[in-house]
Amino acid sequence: MSDDGALLVLEDITVTFDGFKALNSLSLTLEPGELRAVIGPNGAGKTTMMDVITGKTKPDTGVLIFDTLHDLTRLDEPAIARLGIGRKFQRPTVFEPLSVRENLLLSLAGNRNPAFTLWAREKPSERERIDELLTTIRLTDDRHRRAGDLSHGQKQWLEIGMLLAQEPQLLLVDEPVAGMSDAETEQTAELLRDINRTRSLVVVEHDMAFVRALGVKVTVLHEGSVLAEGSIDEIQDDPRVIEVYLGR
């Protein structure tokens, strides 16, 4: 392999389900500190790609290396999470009866069992980290609010904050703005750019206006392979992409 120094390398990854190739010799490289957008029609392989990276699905063939040293194909999901890969699914999963602050406290890296954590006195370092996370996810004024009372967009931000509390190197985010208002969508683009100052991210999204707002390199998947890569303008002008999306 020739991707020395890359944070994540997928090389010729193939995944087959009952004879159907969900991923077909997929190759992709993510550099340290990069924010990458991944788009593609339904069935293009986006979810399967994230399943492979996180260990949920094992590839039939191919190379998958994280942080230049770790062969992810040999590790299970918990081990991959401990290495520093976090995943945000499309639907938010927060502890709705608890407050925003309590959700973040439970998620802090290295924290204790839930019952002890909620009743124990916060350490100064924990309080400081929670304050930082609240600022990042735009929920400082909602710290004592019940998570179940947040808007859909705010729940998405809270779950992103819960993942950040685990101190991942790489964050995989699946359709973060689905169901959001225009204002929340705009703030989410800002949020992900802020996170990208200290973390690498892969964002899977269908909303092209949101992808444009991110202003980053875009990878287009089609039939389990990379169809095109480039800026959003280059992607939208690519005849192959136009044919896949518009059928002409």
Locate the predicted segments by residue.
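Glycine-rich phosphate-binding loops of nucleotide-dependent enzymes
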Residues: 2-248
